[in-house]
C-alpha cells in the first residue's frame, strides 16, 4: 500500500506540472495560435521564478511567506507572459510562421532560463537551493494530511500549487464554455474572418490568450523547481523542465482541447511516466524505463488516429490553428 500511495503522490505532483502547461497551451490554441515555444516559456518561468524567490529570501533578514510566494509566482507569470508577447508579435502582427517561431522560442527560452538559473549557483557548484521558498511551496495541509490516514495521504499531502492547478483548469473550462469572452475566443480560433466581421477584435484576443496562457504555463516551471525538485536549481534543470513541457503539448492533443479533461489526463500521464519505478514493487513486473516514459506519447498518437477516424467536430483542433490571419483577405 505504501508503494501505491507513493506512486499516486509523485504522479499527482508530476501531472500537476504538466497540467499548468496544458491549460496554458489550450487557451493559446483556442485562439488559433500553435505555440510550440511552450518548453522555452515553462523553462523561463521556472528559472526566473526560482531566481526571484532566491534573491528575495537571501536579501531579506526575515522573509515573509506571502511575499515569497508573490515574488516567485509573479516573476514566473510576468516573464512567461512576456515570452508569449514576443510570440504574439511575431506571429499575429508580423505573420511569421507559427511552427518556426514556436520552436525558435523554445531554443531561446531554454537557453535564457539556463543562463539566469546558473547566475545564482555559487562558483564551483552544480546547484543551489531556495530553502525558505521550498518550505513554503512544499507545506502540506496540517490536519487533513496527518489525521485522515490513506485518504489524507492521497488527497491532501501536496503543496498549494497542486490545488491551484486544479482551480486554474476548472476556471479555464468555465471561461471557455460559460462566458461571452470565452465564446468569442473560441470563435476567433475557429474562424477569425467571421469573428472579425461580427465585431470581435481578433488581434486583441490572440494577444491576450497567448500572453495569459504563457503566464499559466510558466507557473508549471516554478512549481517544478520549488516543489517537485525540492527547491533546487541545477545545471540540468532547464532540460528537465523542457521534457515535461513537451508532455504538456502532447496532453493538449490527448484531451482534445478541453481543459477540464487535462486534470485526469495529466495524472494518467504521471502514472504512466513513473510506472517503471513502482510497478516492480507493487506487482513484481519489471518495466523498461524508456518504454514506460514513451507511453504518454504513444497514447497521444492513438488518440489522434482514433479521433481522425471518427471525424467528429467536437474532437478536432480549432479550425484556424497554426494559420495566420490576414484581415484584408476576409
State where each predicted segment sits.
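Membrane-interface helix caps of multi-pass small-molecule transporters
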Residues: 27, 51, 55, 85, ...
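Hydrophobic core segments of alpha-helical transmembrane domains in multi-pass membrane transport
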Residues: 21, 46-50, 110-114, 162-174, ...
Amino acid at each position: 500500500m505504501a508503494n501505491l500511495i507513493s506512486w499516486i503522490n509523485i504522479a499527482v505532483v508530476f501531472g500537476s506540472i504538466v497540467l499548468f502547461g496544458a491549460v496554458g497551451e489550450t487557451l493559446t490554441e483556442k485562439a488559433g495560435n500553435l505555440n510550440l515555444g511552450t518548453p522555452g516559456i515553462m523553462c523561463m518561468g521556472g528559472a526566473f521564478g526560482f531566481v526571484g524567490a532566491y534573491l528575495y529570501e537571501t536579501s531579506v533578514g526575515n522573509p515573509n511567506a506571502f511575499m515569497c510566494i508573490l515574488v516567485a509566482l509573479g516573476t514566473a507569470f510576468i516573464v512567461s507572459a512576456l515570452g508569449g508577447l514576443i510570440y504574439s508579435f511575431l506571429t499575429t502582427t508580423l505573420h511569421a510562421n507559427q511552427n518556426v517561431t514556436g520552436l525558435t522560442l523554445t531554443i531561446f527560452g531554454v537557453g535564457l532560463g539556463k543562463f539566469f538559473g546558473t547566475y545564482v549557483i555559487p562558483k564551483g557548484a552544480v546547484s543551489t537551493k531556495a530553502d525558505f521558498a521550498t518550505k513554503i511551496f512544499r507545506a502540506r495541509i496540517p490536519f487533513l494530511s496527518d489525521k485522515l490516514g490513506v485518504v489524507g495521504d492521497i488527497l491532501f499531502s501536496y503543496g498549494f500549487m497542486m490545488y491551484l492547478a486544479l482551480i486554474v483548469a476548472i476556471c479555464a473550462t468555465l471561461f471557455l464554455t460559460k462566458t461571452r469572452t470565452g465564446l468569442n475566443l473560441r470563435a476567433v480560433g475557429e474562424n477569425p474572418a467571421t469573428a472579425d466581421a461580427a465585431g470581435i477584435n481578433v488581434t486583441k484576443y490572440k494577444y491576450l490568450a497567448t500572453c495569459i496562457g504563457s503566464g499559466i504555463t510558466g507557473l508549471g516551471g516554478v512549481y517544478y523547481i520549488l516543489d517537485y525538485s525540492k527547491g533546487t536549481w541545477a545545471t540540468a534543470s532547464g532540460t528537465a523542465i523542457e521534457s515535461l513541457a513537451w508532455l504538456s503539448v502532447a496532453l493538449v492533443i490527448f484531451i482534445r482541447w478541453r481543459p477540464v479533461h487535462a486534470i485526469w489526463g495529466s495524472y494518467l500521464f504521471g502514472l504512466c511516466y513513473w510506472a517503471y519505478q513502482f510497478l516492480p514493487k507493487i506487482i513484481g513486473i519489471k518495466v523498461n524505463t524508456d518504454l514506460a516514459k514513451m507511453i504518454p506519447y504513444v497514447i497521444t498518437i492513438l488518440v489522434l488516429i482514433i479521433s481522425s477516424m471518427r471525424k467528429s467536430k467536437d474532437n478536432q483542433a480549432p479550425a484556424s490553428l497554426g494559420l495566420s490571419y490576414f484581415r484584408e483577405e476576409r
